[in-house]
């Protein structure tokens, strides 16, 4: 879930890559193509995992003329994008919204022609956090923050003086890449502890299920980390970066007719599943293989420049099948990849060097209340609950006002709420029973919104591994992924373990992996042609 505007904390995790040149349409029968000097359009690429990263990677590969097979062990595509329609209600059990903060998302939307299906939330700038047991409207800009009562006068003064009084990390060079500073330590150095407790803490809980003490600043907020490296002061650096960005955008407007990106968060008509379904329509039955579990990967390159160095073994309906490919894009969770059987030139290739990644559990509870039984309804996006508010009896991470944002998600006489419980704050509570969670959610909503009586509808969905935790040692995970890609030519990794947790970052990760695969295949083709 995302409640705070991402732009307030500038959490761009992506790196742009130059898009490869479009190629000819896909050729027909694979067995008929020239093995010595194939056009790239005859190459075959396997994509393992049909979450949003896998779908994006497969779409990018196919749009460049490649033969693609997308393997998914589950009976449905989309991963953690999952919309349910039931009893006149529409809700998402995974991500509820996304942003268009990455150019890869813009490219995908334009190619799919899906913009007419975008659904913008009503009053999305009205977002709340709990303070002293009650919801408080979150200021939408720095000036409003200084005028509000959300922070003490001391904290406001520290924010205003940050350009002059910010502190370096333990007196060391700020740009020391070995520093494993937490999100809490970083923001406390710049803005103080209250800023962390009542703004950063609920934000990271709402976007990643994490807590600021456990998250790595460099990996959770790399743009702000880099701003400090360049400018020292976060405020000064942010202002200078924005001014520079405006100049660049001004130049782009004069030289191109690019469509402006959607500002803020949005969903789709019918929920986030609409994005998944739209992408899936681009693939035939032979390309998108559901309930097909990949058992093993085998790399057989022996030094000669021949195609189809990869073999993918998969099982569907108790039938095991081996198929040859020229490259593989893997998008499964890294802990699952670690357990995958891989052979390299007929020898087992161990992935023991990949560290275990801690993943955070999350329960999603959907409730409805008759409007007459909600005495203090709030218009807007939702409310986040800081960890400190547990002392005031609040146990949830936050609640989205789903039918306030999107009125078509529920009948006109009820309010639909989406509440989140668990994360690193309370892993055990995430695993509680539906009845227990119903009582917890009802209690929090009664305190925050004045709900009365029992909800008229309850649905509970549990994600045992909702988010990977970008902890202080996350460098070791990224180095392991790089080693895997380096040691296994033609294998590329994508997903929310690499590049960011949001839907947009996951799409960008899939696109970038596809671009690397295309570059790899083009490079091999050029080498073959010179021989």
From Swiss-Prot:
One example GO MF annotation: oxygen-dependent protoporphyrinogen oxidase activity
Protein name as catalogued: Protoporphyrinogen oxidase 2
Annotated organelle transit peptide span: 1-48
A Pfam entry, by short name: Amino_oxidase
Lineage summary: Eukaryota, Viridiplantae, Streptophyta, Embryophyta, Tracheophyta
Summary of the function given for this chain in its UniProt record: Catalyzes the 6-electron oxidation of protoporphyrinogen-IX to form protoporphyrin-IX.
The gene coding this protein: POX2
GO biological process: chlorophyll biosynthetic process; heme biosynthetic process; protoporphyrinogen IX biosynthetic process
Organism: Spinacia oleracea
The protein's annotated pathway: Porphyrin-containing compound metabolism; protoporphyrin-IX biosynthesis; protoporphyrin-IX from protoporphyrinogen-IX: step 1/1; Porphyrin-containing compound metabolism; chlorophyll biosynthesis
Cofactor(s) for this UniProt protein: FAD
